[in-house]
């Protein structure tokens, strides 16, 4: 077999019959499969050993040669080669067809490639191939021209003779009639008898005339058909064709079926055809030109690729290896077989029957029928169901053809090539492991033993516990005591990977150091649950084992959970305390007035109390029970940095140094909390709400190395659990208190609601007004009950503690529990005007229960739909962006995009831009940021972190130019400087990082949180799409629902207000032609926008508009934006619109991820004029290829091509990728492969999918070419100390994670800069 590492591209083409015979190891002549008695393959059948190889290793069919020593011998009795049985997976056979057949992909595909090549309509082609019409293949024009006059004379003679014959017959009949009439008259017959007789005679004469006329017409038809006869002409009338052959057989040839197509192909001159088509394109117009363009695509493909079009008509059919279409015996003695065997058997049966009929010299009509059936059976084999009714097996199930084996989720590509199963893996239920450190996981002993079995066995032999591998295996299987010690030794510092499905982003797989645990459940660290989206209600996780030293190093450095604290989507920490831990820290840092031992100033009768000289003294007091953790006290601190304002007050300009004492007004709990933070971090004297905790961890991640952050969050977790236990926060029915004022509040609002009802019954309000009024009233009522609830609850109520600390839940839920549920929506998303007045504590009435479940069920159904839709969106995003990899350090471009940092308000102060987090943060500066005095605040090429942004704002800079992937000039992929900081590591992105996939995951992962439904904006008006459908609409570049027109030019508006429509005319400033927009529906409403004087009002007559400005409410069409304002604007428009949807749901994704996808949507250029290049007008070309080809042509002083940028939706862009492997594994597999084969496409294997499919290392991360040849070699010391067990003490964090002398890889943040 091929070694995948020795080729860099994969080409696909058309196989001719010659190729098929060369691949083949023999011809399959019989439809037999295996002998049902001996169960051995039949000779010359579909499983024949002579053709495909032996069924048993090193053993021929008849048994004459058995053993490996006869390797390579071909048995003279049975003709089987003695070799391995696995050759039955790779050896092909073939079937020699008695008549050629066309390949259904090229005939039936849309467009029909055969039809375009031969310039035949698909309908006509079908008639020819399936023997419903004859086609003329050649005409001897010269001979016909030379002998035309002779033939015409002959034809005239024949006509004359027909006419003469007719005249003579009529003459004779007329005379006979006269004579008979005379005789009748003589006999004295009556007049009506005579009349009848005459009518009969005239009828016969009429028939004679008609018969002669038909004969003359037929001759005329034959003659005119013959004189106009041309190649590719169809003749449907069988008799006409027979006559033509009889009379003029030497002047032309014709045939039906695939043979005729083959004949036409042989005479087809590709070069001449391409030239004539180019001529038509140059001079033609309209339909003719379009048709020529489409045909030229196919013709040029054959011309350039050197493919022979004969490959579309087959003389032989390949038979795939038998192991790929196996036949297995079931328990009952029956056989289960692959559908392909049935399809092959039909082909062979029909082929053999056809051979026999031809040998017997059967009549044409029978032979043709058999040929048609052969064609249909080959069609069914290649693509069952593409034409006519599919061939069905037992139970009316359509058989799976070769195409079906490739297609869809269960096809070869997605099931077996992109979704392989792996060994060294296991799965089990997860339980929480609060005692673990962040980089550890608990692995069940039995599972670990099975996973590490080979390692344990080798180590047992090394330590002489076992003599050989076999006995070591036996020891492991019997679980002898020594085995556990060895296992403990083997797993030390050998990381494992944990994965939870669905893996929506890269943090769904992380590496951990395993710790052996009893039981059968995997223990998971509580802080990584957020990243895995795991909970402990029965979730399962899979464990994988990295084997090689390189894999272990990558797992440890790149994937260890303590190195993956930040979210790749937003760059903010994901591993932070949640739920109980938040509650615990919140409890710990709460200050309670007048608690035990609180500070009391001195009075006459007592000295000052509640003052402590050190935290230790305060802790002793707490241990004695005279001080509460939450009491306000004064304490002297020496080892903690004071907050900035206190530092300035106590220590002035010199600042605080470790050891300097200062006194804090705080609580013991807060002092204990601050001891968890790293040295030098300013004292935090606040109550720890979840948001405050998040801000602290975020700050730590910006300022300290990852290892410190990991240690800190671990300490916070331990403290959180410890104090949550001691806080006594539990929930019971007694904690749910119904506010006593609830009844009187509701009575008051009931009265108001009754008034509205009466007005409605009197007719003073219509239905909609009544509903709106009731909704308003009940919203107010709900708010007031909520407020009463707030006032009624004590501060230390556990439910309030849980909600206020940010641990979980919100006030709405508390209100539903204890106050009232309030208004609920119906499935359309409208409020039902009757509220649910009861709370869950009191219980709901039947009606309330019903309307409440209504909404809840809608929610569940929505979630299920959303998950599927969001998954599909992620798949399309990954596909379109999978080859965006960081390819170089800097593309040296001068271009960039301008981002706003702040808005200057009239009084001169700056207001920080709301979305600075996702736009400017973590970017590389594209130009020096200079203040008004000309000082450079931040230099070009610097990374914009939080401190830099603060400095820019302090200097009064409102906008900066930053580098962006939208303006990156790297050919394939992007450069590190344009991409900027990697959100997951907080450093400049490494070369080789697969930023495309990270972008797709960052956008797709929160997809399930987006809403499904389209919401109404302002009651009436068109539906404005929102949520997931809107994101899809944008990424697929569809024309939006409720499309709003945009101004094509800058100028003044003339607004005409009609009855149902507006008409807007823009008079351009430059005096050009006026632009008119009419039939603008009034339901859509005019756009509100800011005017020069700062006021906001609706667009009105005489307003001034800028180019690209939206004129109506709704969404602009991105294709219009591209046409009017160009590619840069449409990119920014798409990024902004996508962000709007995510921000509405409170999801933070950095702009750069969306930019990566948008860049891929605008990669192509459509050719308008091909100049001197090879491009065809109207074709889509990659921008990089377009520019390089133009440079080449200009250098050779030719005419460059002209192109226009195109916006493609992500599905279309994925299918238009250069890699046919990637496109085929995405969607429309047969269409992609058909096209690729005709064009003889070559896949350069640049993306990730292609490499996964053929089993190479992906060209990303450490698999990138520049790192390919780095070898890892352990040093002697490392070898010597490979197995020393680290002691798992409590303080497991040492500078390099573990106090062992073992070969631990230090977990500092590796800077890869020196490898550049």
Swiss-Prot record:
Pfam families: RNA_pol_Rpb1_1, RNA_pol_Rpb1_2, RNA_pol_Rpb1_3, RNA_pol_Rpb1_4, RNA_pol_Rpb1_5. Binds 1 Mg(2+) ion per subunit. Binds 2 Zn(2+) ions per subunit. Its EC number is 2.7.7.6. Its cofactor is Mg(2+); Zn(2+). It catalyses: RNA(n) + a ribonucleoside 5'-triphosphate = RNA(n+1) + diphosphate. Zn(2+) 2 binds at residues 891, 968, 975, 978. It is an enzyme of class 2 (transferase). GO terms for molecular function: DNA binding; DNA-directed RNA polymerase activity; magnesium ion binding; zinc ion binding. Belongs to the RNA polymerase beta' chain family. This is DNA-directed RNA polymerase subunit beta'. It comes from Mycobacterium leprae (strain TN).
């Amino acid at each position: 077999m091929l070694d995948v590492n020795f080729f860099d591209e994969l080409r696909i083409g058309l196989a001719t019959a010659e190729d098929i015979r060369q691949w083949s190891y023999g011809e399959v002549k019989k439809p037999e499969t295996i002998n049902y008695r001996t169960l051995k393959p039949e000779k010359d059948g579909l499983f024949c050993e002579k053709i495909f190889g032996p069924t048993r290793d090193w053993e021929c069919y008849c048994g004459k040669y058995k053993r490996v020593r006869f390797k390579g011998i071909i048995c003279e009795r049975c003709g089987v080669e003695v070799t391995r049985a696995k050759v039955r997976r790779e050896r092909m056979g073939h079937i020699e067809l008695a008549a050629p057949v066309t390949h259904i992909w090229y005939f039936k595909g849309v467009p029909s490639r055969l039809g375009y090549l031969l310039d035949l309509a698909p309908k006509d082609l079908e008639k020819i191939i399936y023997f419903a019409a004859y086609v003329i293949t050649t005409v001897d024009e010269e001979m016909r021209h030379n002998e035309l006059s002779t033939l015409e004379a002959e034809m005239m003679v024949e006509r004359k003779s027909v006419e003469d014959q007719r005249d003579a017959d009529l003459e004779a009949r007329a005379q006979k009639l006269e004579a008979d009439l005379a005789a009748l008259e003589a006999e004295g017959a009556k007049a009506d008898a005579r009349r009848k007789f005459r009518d009969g005679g005239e009828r016969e004469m009429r028939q004679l005339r008609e018969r002669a006329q038909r004969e003359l017409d037929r001759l005329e038809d034959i003659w005119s058909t013959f004189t106009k006869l041309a190649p590719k002409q169809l003749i449907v009338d069988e008799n006409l064709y027979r006559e033509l052959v009889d009379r003029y057989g030497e002047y032309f040839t014709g045939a039906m079926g695939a043979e005729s197509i083959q004949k036409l192909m042989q005479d087809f001159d590709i070069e001449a055809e391409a030239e004539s088509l180019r001529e038509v394109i140059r001079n033609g117009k309209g339909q003719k030109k379009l048709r020529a363009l489409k045909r030229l695509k196919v013709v040029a493909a054959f011309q350039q690729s050197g493919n022979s079009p004969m490959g579309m008509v087959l003389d032989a059919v390949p038979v795939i290896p038998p192991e790929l279409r196996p036949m297995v015996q079931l328990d009952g003695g029956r056989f289960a077989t692959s559908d392909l065997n049935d399809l092959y058997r039909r082909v062979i049966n029909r082929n053999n029957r056809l051979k026999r009929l031809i040998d017997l010299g059967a009549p044409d009509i029978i032979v043709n029928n058999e040929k048609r059936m052969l064609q249909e059976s080959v069609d069914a084999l290649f693509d069952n169901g593409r034409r006519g009714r599919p061939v069905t097996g037992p139970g009316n199930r359509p058989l799976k053809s070769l195409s079906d084996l490739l297609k869809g989720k269960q096809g070869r590509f997605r099931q077996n090539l992109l979704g392989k199963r792996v060994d060294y893996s296991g799965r089990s239920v997860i339980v929480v492991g609060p005692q673990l450190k962040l980089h550890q996981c608990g692995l069940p002993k039995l599972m670990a033993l099975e996973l590490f079995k080979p390692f344990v066995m080798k180590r047992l032999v090394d330590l002489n516990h076992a003599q050989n591998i076999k006995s070591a295996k036996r020891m492991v299987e019997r679980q002898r005591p020594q085995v556990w010690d060895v296992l403990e030794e083997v797993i030390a510092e050998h990381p494992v990977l944990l994965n939870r499905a669905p893996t929506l982003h890269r943090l769904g797989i992380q590496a951990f150091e395993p710790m052996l645990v009893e039981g059968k459940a995997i223990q998971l660290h509580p802080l990584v649950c957020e990243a895995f989206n795991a909970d402990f209600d029965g979730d399962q996780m899979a464990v994988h084992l990295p084997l090689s030293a390189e894999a272990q190093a990558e797992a440890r450095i790149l994937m260890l959970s303590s190195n993956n604290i930040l979210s790749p989507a937003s760059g903010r920490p994901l591993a932070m305390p949640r739920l109980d831990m938040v509650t615990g820290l919140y409890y710990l840092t709460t200050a309670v007035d007048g608690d035990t031992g609180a500070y009391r100033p001195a009075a006459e009768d007592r000295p000052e109390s509640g003052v402590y000289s050190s935290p230790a003294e305060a802790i002793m007091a707490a241990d004695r029970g005279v001080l509460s953790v939450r009491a306000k006290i004064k304490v002297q601190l020496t080892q903690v940095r004071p907050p900035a304002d206190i530092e300035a007050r106590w220590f002035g300009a010199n600042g605080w140094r470790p050891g300097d004492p200062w006194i804090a007004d705080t609580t013991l709990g807060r002092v204990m909390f601050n001891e968890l933070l790293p040295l030098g971090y300013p004292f935090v004297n606040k109550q720890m709400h979840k948001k405050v905790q998040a801000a602290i961890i975020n700050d730590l991640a910006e300022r300290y190395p990852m290892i410190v952050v990991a240690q800190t969050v671990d300490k916070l977790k331990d403290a959180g659990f410890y104090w949550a236990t001691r806080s006594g926060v539990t929930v019971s029915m007694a904690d749910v208190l119904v506010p006593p004022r609830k009844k009187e509040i509701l009575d008051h609002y009931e009265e108001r609601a009754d008034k509205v009802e009466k007005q409605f019954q009197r007719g003073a309000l219509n239905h909609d007004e009544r509903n709106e009024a009731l909704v308003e009233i009940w919203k107010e009522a709900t708010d007031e009950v909520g407020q009463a609830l707030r006032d009624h609850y004590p501060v230390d109520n556990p439910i309030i503690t849980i909600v206020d600390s940010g641990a979980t839940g919100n006030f709405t839920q508390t209100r539903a529990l204890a106050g009232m549920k309030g208004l609920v929506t119906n499935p359309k998303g409208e409020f039902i005007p009757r509220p649910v007045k009861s709370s869950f504590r009191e219980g709901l009435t039947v009606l309330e229960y019903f309307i409440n479940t209504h909404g809840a069920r809608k929610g569940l159904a929505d979630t299920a739909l959303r998950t599927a839709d969001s998954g599909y969106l992620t798949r399309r995003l990954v596909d379109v962006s999978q080859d965006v990899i960081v390819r170089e350090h800097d593309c040296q471009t001068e271009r960039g995009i301008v981002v706003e940092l702040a808005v200057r308000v009239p009084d001169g102060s700056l207001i920080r831009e709301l979305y600075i987090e996702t736009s400017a943060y973590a970017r590389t500066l594209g130009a020096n940021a200079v203040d008004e005095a000309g000082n450079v605040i931040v230099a070009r090429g610097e990374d914009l972190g939080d401190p830099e942004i603060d400095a820019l704002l302090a200097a009064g800079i409102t906008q900066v130019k930053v580098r962006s992937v939208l303006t990156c000039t790297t050919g394939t992929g992007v450069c590190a400087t344009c991409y900027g900081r990697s959100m997951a590591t907080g450093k400049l992105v490494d070369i080789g990082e697969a930023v495309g996939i990270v972008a797709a995951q960052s956008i797709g992962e929160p997809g399930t949180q987006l809403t499904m439904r389209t919401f109404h904006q302002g009651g009436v008006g068109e539906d404005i799409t929102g949520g997931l459908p809107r994101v899809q609409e944008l990424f697929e570049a569809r024309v939006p629902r409720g499309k709003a027109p945009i101004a094509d030019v800058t100028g003044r508006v003339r607004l005409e207000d009609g009855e149902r429509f507006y008409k807007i005319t823009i008079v351009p400033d430059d005096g050009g032609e006026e632009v008119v927009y009419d039939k603008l529906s009034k339901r859509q409403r005019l756009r509100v926008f800011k005017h020069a004087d700062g006021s906001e009002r609706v667009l009105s007559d005489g307003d001034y508009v800028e180019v690209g400005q939206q004129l109506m409410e709704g969404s602009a069409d991105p294709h219009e934006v591209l046409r009017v304002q160009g590619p840069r604007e449409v990119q920014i428009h798409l990024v902004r619109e996508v962000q709007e949807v995510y921000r509405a749901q409170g999801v933070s994704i950095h702009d750069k991820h969306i930019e990566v996808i948008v860049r891929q949507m605008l990669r192509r250029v459509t050719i308008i004029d091909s100049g001197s290049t090879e491009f065809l007008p109207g074709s889509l070309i990659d921008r990089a290829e377009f520019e390089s080809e133009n440079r080449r042509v200009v250098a050779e002083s030719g005419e460059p091509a002209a192109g226009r940028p195109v916006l493609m939706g992500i599905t279309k862009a994925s299918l238009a990728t250069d890699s046919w492997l990637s496109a085929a594994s995405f969607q429309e597999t047969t269409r992609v492969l058909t096209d690729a084969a005709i064009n003889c496409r070559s896949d350069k294997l640049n993306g990730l999918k292609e490499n996964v499919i053929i089993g190479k290392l992906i060209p990303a991360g450490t698999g990138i070419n520049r790192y390919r040849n780095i070898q890892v070699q352990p040093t002697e010391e490392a070898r010597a100390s490979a197995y020393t067990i680290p002691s798992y003490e409590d303080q497991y964090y040492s500078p390099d994670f573990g106090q062992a002398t073992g070969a631990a890889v230090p977990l500092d943040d590796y800077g890869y800069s020196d490898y550049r």
